[in-house]
Design a protein with these regions (language model features):
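Active-site hotspot residues in diverse enzymes, especially metal/ion-binding acidic/histidine motifs
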Residues: 1-243
Length: 243
């Protein structure tokens, strides 16, 4: 099953609305409130009934997470030797590097997005009868800007999980609220991946609100019309003096 971005947004809206009512109660209905970031750990464990744990998943850090749809065994290679990870239905295993003391803060955004990605796979699995042949899913490392050519069903599955994961972490209604406070709902501007100082402060504020990386925030903001992306060469350093 291949879903459009519009359909993915509709799924996210329905899921988040239901979760917010149960988790935030009457606060979710307050029209004057600030944005409510999704507490993804509670969303995974309390709302989706997923069991989240941490293990070393690869020697080179190339696998961020695994999730299981049925009881299964997954083979991984760590330090040159093969070993098995036994997964129960609804298990999620994230790489243990996320909880190493020096990484807890540094990789917080990546950990949250990886968990949201695995949550999205579980939600999509319930909607997609074609996926019932699959026992588990792994999330590999994504380099660069995270874009990929969508050729296979697996490519589409990954794109859909990334899109739904982003919409769960940064729901459009909550992004609208945040951007009203941060920049009066006006779009930010970036040049490649660079921002002028004032917009850099604003996107960093956005990242702090939603607990996401700058790249994840930029992709989501651009998707929702809150970021204008220009070419690198259009950037002009405000401190640069021209002769």
């Amino acid at each position: 099953m291949i879903l459009s971005q519009k359909k993915i947004e509709e799924i996210a809206v329905a899921v988040i609305r239901d979760f917010q009512k149960s988790f935030f109660g009457s606060e979710a209905d307050d029209p004057a409130r600030f944005a409510l970031p999704t507490p993804i750990d509670q969303f995974a464990s309390d709302y989706l009934n997923l069991k989240v744990s941490f293990q070393k998943l690869s020697s080179d850090g190339s696998i961020y997470g695994l999730t299981a749809y049925v009881d299964t065994e997954y083979q991984i290679e760590v330090d040159g030797s093969q070993r098995s990870i036994f997964l129960k239905t609804n298990d999620v295993v994230l790489d243990k590097s996320f909880i190493e003391p020096e990484n807890i803060r540094k990789l917080c955004g990546k950990r949250r997005f990886t968990l949201a990605h695995e949550c999205a796979h579980q939600i999509l699995f319930q909607l997609n009868s074609d996926d019932r042949k699959i026992a588990c899913h792994k999330r590999p490392e994504v380099r660069g800007n995270g874009s990929r050519v969508l050729r296979t069903q697996e490519d589409w599955n990954e794109w859909q999980a990334n899109s739904l994961g982003a919409a769960i972490l940064m729901p459009q209604s909550e992004v609208d609220r945040a951007m009203w406070f941060i920049n009066s709902r006006k779009p930010l501007t970036c040049y490649g991946w660079r921002f002028y100082d004032k917009d850099q402060v604003k996107i960093d504020t956005f990242c702090g609100v939603f607990g996401v990386s700058r790249s994840a925030a930029a992709i989501r903001l651009e998707q929702l019309g809150y970021l204008n992306r220009k070419k690198d060469y259009e950037y002009r350093d405000p401190l640069e003096v021209w002769p």
